[in-house]
């Protein structure tokens, strides 16, 4: 549903505008009249963006939420995923929307990736956030169609433009379509390895690996921050797990 996607991203961009304006508002400003006027204008901008965002959110739910059937629009994974990821779903309906995503992904489509370049940007992190790390791991590792593992199992050395890049007719134009990787890499670093940014620019770091995934034998990961290298190396042992970390 193109209108749903456009409206959801309009709301998301308004949230970014609020953050950008707030960052400027929090910066020191000159005490002269020009500085005071700029400060006042930023405060007014924030209020305007907030009011517009609430209006968009209200209209979004009024237009796309099917109260009778308990899903958004045409009930695709992306249609339910975007409002959940962008915090547009009313609190009373969040669990219901999460269940729709799991049902569609696991039960209806046999635990395969059922979204394209738009939805896949948010799929893994939302599965983790809703507590379904088991589903996220299956999607990350299976070799069935459609999925990243299917590409690798069929000779891909980069990310295809299409999930069925080996059989598409007409053939795909791009064999290096990195955007279809979605949020898989953040999932690997932030969830599996547990290296998480807890403050802007990695000024603070949270370390929380996915020890609960018994299927994972070991993880070796590192990330270069502005303050130095962070590493997280862990492995399963007979007693539980062994974890080695280093921080700047």
Regions found by a protein language model. Give the residues of each.
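Non-catalytic C-terminal accessory modules of carbohydrate-active enzymes
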Residues: 33-40, 51, 55, 134-248
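Catalytic cores of carbohydrate-active enzymes
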Residues: 2-5, 9-172
């Amino acid at each position: 549903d193109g209108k749903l996607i456009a409206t959801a991203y309009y709301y998301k961009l308004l949230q970014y505008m609020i953050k950008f304006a707030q960052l400027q508002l929090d910066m020191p400003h000159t005490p002269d009249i020009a500085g005071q006027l700029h400060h006042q204008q930023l405060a007014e901008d924030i209020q305007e963006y907030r009011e517009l965002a609430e209006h968009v959110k209200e209209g979004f739910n009024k237009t796309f939420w099917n109260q009778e059937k308990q899903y958004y629009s045409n009930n695709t994974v992306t249609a339910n995923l975007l409002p959940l990821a962008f915090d547009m779903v009313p609190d009373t309906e969040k669990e219901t929307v999460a269940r729709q995503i799991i049902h569609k992904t696991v039960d209806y489509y046999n635990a395969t990736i059922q979204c394209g370049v738009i939805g896949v940007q948010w799929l893994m992190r939302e599965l983790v956030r809703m507590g379904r790390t088991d589903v996220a791991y299956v999607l990350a590792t299976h070799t069935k169609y459609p999925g990243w593992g299917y590409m690798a199992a069929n000779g891909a050395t980069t990310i295809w433009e299409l999930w069925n890049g080996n059989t598409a007719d007409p053939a795909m134009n791009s064999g290096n379509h990195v955007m279809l990787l979605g949020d898989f890499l953040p999932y690997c670093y932030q969830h599996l390895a547990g290296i998480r940014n807890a403050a802007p620019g990695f000024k603070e770091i949270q370390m929380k690996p996915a020890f609960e995934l018994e299927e994972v034998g070991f993880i070796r990961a590192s990330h270069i921050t502005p303050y130095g290298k962070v590493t997280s190396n862990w492995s399963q042992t007979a007693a539980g797990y062994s974890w080695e970390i280093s921080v700047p």
